[in-house]
Amino acid sequence: MKTKEFHFNLSHSLIEQYPSEKRGSSRLIVLDPQLQKIYHKNSVNNILKYINSNIFNNSKARKSRIYAESEMSSNVEFLILDRIDTNLFTALVSKSKKQIIGNFYKFPEGLMDEILSKNSSEVVLKFNNNVGEDYFEKHCFVPLPSYIKRDYDKIDEDRYQTIYSKYVGSTASATAGLHFSRDLFSAFENNNIEYDFITLHVGAGTFLPVRSKKVEEHNMHFETFLIKDFVAVRLQNAKLLGKRILSIVTTTLRALESSYDNNLKKFKTGQQSTNLFIYPGKNYCFKFVDMLFTNFHTPQSTLLMLVSSFAGKDFVFSFYEEAINKGYKFFSYGDAMLILNNI
């Protein structure tokens, strides 16, 4: 399958630049792939009538965008990705062709680092002191994606994180979760709607476009995740009772599908990793997740391919076209979709 089959054109005016005035107030498009039906709702709060068992990803996006001064006194932007050791990190770097192995950079508080190795725009940084999460919290900005074309705003520190985020480790926020408000969680409890949490740390590769000409040739990145024993038991019981499992965000779906043993009807629990790549043509059979809540995804991304596998590629592109024509807002701060079943 050709990667370009997952391209679509989108006016910049439909890429939402700011969060909604209130969590949950974004528009919701409800989709039934089996009946090929599309329903338009004026807010995410309309989700309640469709659901009875939800699973969220409670990873928290690290404040990871930071600026340093090069030996030539120019400003260089780094996006911290993963911790290798107490003073070793992988990172993406701006002006990457000019940043070479052996270069030194001055960070806030006089912290120095050196590029130890480099692969394209990704580098390994060695700091001259150990670096804790408190340093990033103090000196870094939240990692807004490149399609948000504006200056950083203080509101992003709150609204680019979900209200239930708990464990720092993601390179980017699992943004469909941004819609969920405290009022909506209260409504879950008042309506006896179950919810639980897993933790999957979102990697940079999640949101990058597929570069290979053929989808099948894409080298899928690994992401680490954790499913606790008691969460696994609750989910397994919900499934046995015939409840329909709603995955909040695609990253949650990847973790659940990677960990669930369809023969034993059980999850593997504890710390794990996955490079599961779900796309149309793979003939992937979804084992555990029945419904999916997510945002609109970027062209040629693995997330768009996953949704196309879940709901059917032709149906996905038909409702994307309808959403564009009706002025839905796209991507991280945009509107949401609820897919009621998979094909």
UniProtKB/Swiss-Prot annotation:
Record-level Gene Ontology MF annotations: S-adenosylmethionine:tRNA ribosyltransferase-isomerase activity
One cellular-component annotation, GO: cytoplasm
Keyword Membrane appears in the UniProt entry: no
Reactions listed under catalytic activity: 7-aminomethyl-7-carbaguanosine(34) in tRNA + S-adenosyl-L-methionine = epoxyqueuosine(34) in tRNA + adenine + L-methionine + 2 H(+)
Enzyme Commission numbers on file: 2.4.99.17
A biological-process GO annotation: queuosine biosynthetic process
TM annotation in the entry: none
Keywords annotated in UniProt: Cytoplasm, Queuosine biosynthesis, S-adenosyl-L-methionine, Transferase
Subcellular localization(s) per the UniProt record: Cytoplasm
Protein purpose: Transfers and isomerizes the ribose moiety from AdoMet to the 7-aminomethyl group of 7-deazaguanine (preQ1-tRNA) to give epoxyqueuosine (oQ-tRNA).
NCBIfam families hit by this protein: PRK00147.1 (NF001140), queA (TIGR00113)
Subunit structure: Monomer.
Protein name listed in UniProt: S-adenosylmethionine:tRNA ribosyltransferase-isomerase
Organism from which the protein derives: Borreliella burgdorferi (strain ATCC 35210 / DSM 4680 / CIP 102532 / B31)
Name of encoding gene: queA
